[in-house]
Amino acid sequence: NVPVARQFVLLEAAALAVTGTLSLYADGFRIKWPNDIYYKDRKISGTLSECNIGSNGITQCIIGIGININQQMFTSDAPNPISLAQILGAESDRKEILDQLIYSMEQYLRKVSEGQFDDIHTLYQQKLYRANGRHRYRDNNGEFRAEIENIKPNGHMILKREDGTLSEYAFKEVTFI
């Protein structure tokens, strides 16, 4: 069982499984907090999740992962999509990628079931998009520059602003610019 306070580890595991799978094809995939996967400054994958909570922790969690594999053109209003085919210059076998993703997800879920939360969290932080340097962000008070100080085990992101102030954000409370 995963304690409620550590449910973010399931999203970390999923993000690591996706980056690990895609890294078999090319280098440079990073996790954009909390769970999108980027190649350079373009989004290749997104994840949605819904977890049920019981008295002993997480009882069930459904994780949906979308990966742009062979798309050459995008018709959505997403501002920065990219596909594996665009990166590689050739199409890939979707079944092969799915099999590799399932295998990788099973490996990470095994680590979760063994309680290796801190190991997964460390790996997640090592793969973060924009992990180094100051970047532009926006919250309810406007735009600012900051660097990622930490991602807490509960999934909150700590940003260190240029004046040294630390700000903590839950999902959707801050936007990368």
Regions found by a protein language model. Give the residues of each.
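Long, positively charged amphipathic alpha-helical accessory segments at protein N-termini or as interdomain linkers
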Residues: P3-A5, E12-F29, Y39-I177
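Short loop/edge segments at beta-strand edges and connector loops
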Residues: I31-W33
